[in-house]
Amino acid sequence: MGSRESHLYEKPSEKLEEFIQNHLRPSEDCQKDIDQSVDTICEVLQEPCPSLTVTGVAKGGSYGRRTVLRGNSDGILVVFFGDLEQFQDQEKRQYELLSKIWAQMKHCESTWKLAAKMELQNTNRSSRVTIQLSTKQQSITFNVLPAFNALGLSEKSSLWSYRELKRSLDMVKARPGEFSVCFTELQEKFFSNYPSKLKDLILLVKHWFQKCQEKLINSSLLPPYALELLTVYAWEQGCGAEDFDMAEGVRTVLRLIEKQEQLCVYWTVNYNFGDEIVRNILLSQLQAPRPVILDPTDPTNNVSMDNTCWLQLKHEAQNWLRSLRQNESPGPSWNVLPASLYITPGHLLDKFVKDFLQPNQTFQDQIKKALKIICSFLEENCFRHSTTKIQVIQGGSTVKGTALKTGSDASLVVFANSLKSYTSPKNERYNIIKEIHEQLEACRQEKDFEVKFEISKWKPPWVLSFTLKSKVLNESVDFDVLPAFNALGELKSGSTPSPRTYTELIHLYKPSDVFLEGEFSACFTKLQRNFVRSLPLKLKDLIRLLKHWYCGCEKKLKQKGSLPPKYALELLSIYAWEKGSGAQDFDMAEGFRTVLELVIQYQHLCVFWTVNYSFDDEILRNFLLGQIRRTRPVILDPADPTGDVGGGHRWCWHLLAKEATEWLSSLCFKDKSGCPIQPWNVPKKRVQTPGSCGAGIYSMVNEMHLLRSHRFLD
């Protein structure tokens, strides 16, 4: 595209919406005239006639989906005949039925009073009948197609219709998607459920495609329907809101086009993996060469088959995205993967993590440099004319090595010598945050960074946060700044905290009071970081995979209840690996399945470690015994014994368990030959822990525990 079009897409979202309104969306008057004309034609086609047994007419194409561009567009009128008893009948009798439709329409043509101008065309000896409806600013050409009514009197699809579809395709050796027109009513219904602004985004993408067609060879071979579905997928996976940033939306679609070699898009609203015949159709389609975009109404219809056109569109998308600002990202887009984890075969999970979940190493190096500058600046400049001194340490997934490519979180924990205890006054914490906020602003202005450094607006008493973004990639990390009491003091590498560190905390612990479990976990950030940082790289990739899975669950289930924290799954992943594998290299699918099996069995979980605290101290021992007797699941933070991220009934583990159960049917847990992948053997063995001095032994039967100090195991 030329520079004028590139500048168009650089405009703010509100300008794009204005452009759509003024140039892309059909005028209301034109749309109304064409709608009235179409309704009249449909009524005529359904009038009783000796030669026609019409049971209904469906509206399809761009017209039926309500994605018509101003100017010239397309539509389909699907005429269902009652005497067509199976899919293949429409092919056998196409010539005959089109001839009858043509005769009926010509007979009635002179009596019609249409709001739009109509032109009938019958080409190639009645193998094609078209109706062109025109107004002053709009023209829509409708193909008229006879079809078998696959839905019958129902408004929904049925297993029978898809089984019969497969049988008919095999019988007449028709190409996949040959009979997709029979499901036009479902297609119309599918698009009717989406907000009008999403359809405006579709218009913008189709407009971009039209501009591409003007300069590309064979681009017409790709149906616009493929790009419409890709746009719906981008919105569903990345946004889902009725109101959104139009510029972000179009960037997201173009970035997906860039990744066309990995695209695999499908829906399960009309069909799913439950029936064996349909499942086999789906699996065959989803394992075909990319790109794959399945018609949500017909599982045999891959609408993205033309690879040549996709390569050309990829080139155009890359040119557009890179033409905006040299050496800088063209702007934010939604976080949408080109393929779903659910349909990724087990032997390809390592590649999935590498391609889609691991952060870019160059960006990670830039983050490390930026954090080094920021931490040094804060330590040198905060409270320069005061006795208060601070130490800044990094926490969260970035420093632990478990960050995702997008949406990663991290923390800067600020230890100040003015915070003398866990419960230091809140006004002292406020003063620290206020000073850090001022110095962060100074640091951002004075220092040069290889990344974008954005500080959020801070309003006390809310958390102070900032973001580091790549200037080239669609990657970023969000940081929270947390003032904390330095409970560990100058803890030497490899040593464990003094029991006194925890006994002071335990004395504050009152489950029924305002004290929140794990409220002071920031004080133990260094221990949390060290616990994970030393683990094998592949285990960190398993953690990434579980976090990605969790994010999908969170998006799906957020309206139904509060899910347990991601940290719980991180700890379960470590537990599963330590008890079930322990190898540096392992089968990713086996590890993934093992963790999901643990989630399913959440009502029996009791997981804890003794690397930083143990049963040796009496106060700690009594407290730990109380913790591990609590309602399951129990998953204790290895750095903070008051932090139970299992939480018993506190979170909706049952929702996560239900989702995990459904996922056991996914391709993730099938090997190359289609056989089920088994989980690791994580035993539910009797584990014994010592009671208080000489008081006997407390047994927990059929519970799952982990103690890195194996002296407590049977």
Swiss-Prot record:
PROSITE patterns: 25A_SYNTH_2, 25A_SYNTH_3. GO terms for cellular component: cytosol; membrane; nucleoplasm; perinuclear region of cytoplasm. It is found in: Cytoplasm; Cytoplasm, Perinuclear region. CDD domains: NT_2-5OAS_ClassI-CCAase. Signal peptide: none annotated. A lipid is attached at G2 (N-myristoyl glycine). Myristoylation is not essential for its activity. Glycosylated. Glycosylation is essential for its activity. Produced as a latent enzyme which is activated by double stranded RNA (dsRNA) generated during the course of viral infection. The dsRNA activator must be at least 15 nucleotides long, and no modification of the 2'-hydroxyl group is tolerated. ssRNA or dsDNA do not act as activators. Strongly inhibited by copper, iron and zinc ions. Partially inhibited by cobalt and nickel ions. Mg(2+) binds at D409, D480. It comes from the Eukaryota. Its main location: cytoplasm. InterPro entries: 2-5-oligoAdlate_synth_1_dom2/C, 2-5OAS_C_CS, NT_2-5OAS_ClassI-CCAase, NT_sf, Polymerase_NTP_transf_dom. It is an enzyme of class 2 (transferase). GO terms for biological process: antiviral innate immune response; defense response to virus; interleukin-27-mediated signaling pathway; negative regulation of viral genome replication; regulation of lactation; response to virus; type I interferon-mediated signaling pathway. Keywords: Antiviral defense, ATP-binding, Cytoplasm, Glycoprotein, Immunity, Innate immunity, Lipoprotein, Magnesium, Metal-binding, Myristate, Nucleotide-binding, Nucleotidyltransferase, Repeat, RNA-binding, Transferase. Its EC number is 2.7.7.84. It catalyses: 3 ATP = 5'-triphosphoadenylyl-(2'->5')-adenylyl-(2'->5')-adenosine + 2 diphosphate. Its cofactor is Mg(2+). The keyword Glycoprotein applies. Homodimer. Interferon-induced, dsRNA-activated antiviral enzyme which plays a critical role in cellular innate antiviral response. Activated by detection of double stranded RNA (dsRNA): polymerizes higher oligomers of 2'-5'-oligoadenylates (2-5A) from ATP which then bind to the inactive monomeric form of ribonuclease L (RNASEL) leading to its dimerization and subsequent activation. Activation of RNASEL leads to degradation of cellular as well as viral RNA, resulting in the inhibition of protein synthesis, thus terminating viral replication. This is 2'-5'-oligoadenylate synthase 2. The lineage of its organism: Eukaryota, Metazoa, Chordata, Craniata, Vertebrata. The gene is OAS2.
